[in-house]
Curated annotation (Swiss-Prot):
Main function: Potential odorant receptor.
Subcellular locations according to the entry: Cell membrane
Gene symbol of the encoding locus: Or5p54
Glycosylated position list: 5, 165, 265
Name used for this protein in its record: Olfactory receptor 5P54
Xref: Pfam families: 7tm_4 (PF13853)
Gene Ontology MF: a single term: G protein-coupled receptor activity
SUPFAM superfamilies membership: Family A G protein-coupled receptor-like
Amino acid sequence: MNGGNHTSMTELFILGPTEDPTFCIAFFVIFLGVYMVTLVGNISIITLIRISSQLHTPVYLFLNHLAFVDILYSTLVSVIMLMELLEHELALPVAACAAELCITVLFGSSECFLLAAMAYDCYVAICSPLLYSTLMSSRVCFLLLGMSYVGGCMNGWIFTGCLLNLSFYGPYQIDHFFCDFSPLLKLSCSDVSIIGIIPSISSGSIIVVTVLVIAVFYICILMTILKMHSTDGCHKAFSTCNSYLTAVTLYYGTITFIYVMPKSNYSTEKNKVLSEFYTVVIPMLNHLIYSLKNRDVKDALRKAIVRVYT
């Protein structure tokens, strides 16, 4: 990082979710439980998709990668947060902090693109079922996956590049539970009038574009569903859309508040709560929302259990 005329910063101290020792143990138990549920649930989804031939379809390929992203994302944030709760304050080298910021933004942005890709898959399946094998070929699927990760990488590099161009002065304490851009910005002695808004513009663009893509696809899906004469077909389509839209609303709602809304609109504590929700809780909810309400996944799980015990 550019140190300017100030003392060069070599490490940062992350204060964690709370500075009250009374709550540290309770928070540790809660977040450890949430992390274990996230880990076991998403690993189970990945394993089930791999071993069940009936789930070897594009939608479950995207779900497989969504689970993979959630595992890495929640692991990176949760492990550091649990260490903070045990030690009440965690010292991280600047390079490690920059790497954490880059990786969390990378996977968070990739998740936005994956959700948009899943919306496209649902659109093709409902609106153009006869062309599904052509429009969702292996080549198209891997292209969508590649674009998701490349888009995430670009946003991660933008955040990290802005961070590395800031100058800092002590005390080097981050009032947060991971190396997020907004708390780091408060430590800077640089002019942040431009650098401070670049990440918001970048993240805001990703959110707006992917939300518009999802909205267009689901308007088309809704119009197609309303034209259906089969009650069972309508019910199945609405059920699929309902679980997806629930996950989308939760995810996009929180990241919009954190990365797009003006920082003066909410307090540090509210920022912490929102960040905990989308970095720790949402990865746990995703596999529950997508899987437990999905008939194909439940059937595949039932068959897998039967194979194990017979």
